[in-house]
Amino acid sequence: MISEVDVRASLNEIIDPCSTAAGCSAGLDEMGLVRAVEVRETASGTDIRVVIGVTEYGCLMGAPFANEAYKRLQALPGAAIITVELDGKFDWDRDDMRADYQERLKRHRIVRGLLRIPVVVTPLASPSAPKVSADLSR
């Protein structure tokens, strides 16, 4: 029997490239792009219907997301009829992201902010020049 948790876990393996470009990769479920999941047991197996969204109207990832979602869901043991739809509302908001991903993204942005401290590097520094280091463990 395939559960909604199984479906969401499978879809979360599909990484949103914009999250990767931002330096903090997230799957579709973490990003809040899995808009709906329906799982129904039938005599022939589990029918699965999902609705996938994108973050904005101009996003070109809708079709690739849907194609990859179909492949991954079809590969689940016991999957029968798979229906993948694209959400045409384009109403995604940052609040749609899962809370655990929002926290991870927040920590990433804090670290990224610390890494933007300007550092002057002298390529031909003498051995007696002071060494500069930063403690980023805080």
Briefly describe each language-model feature range:
Residues 1-138:
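Domain-level signature for proteins that mediate thiol-based redox and metal-cofactor handling
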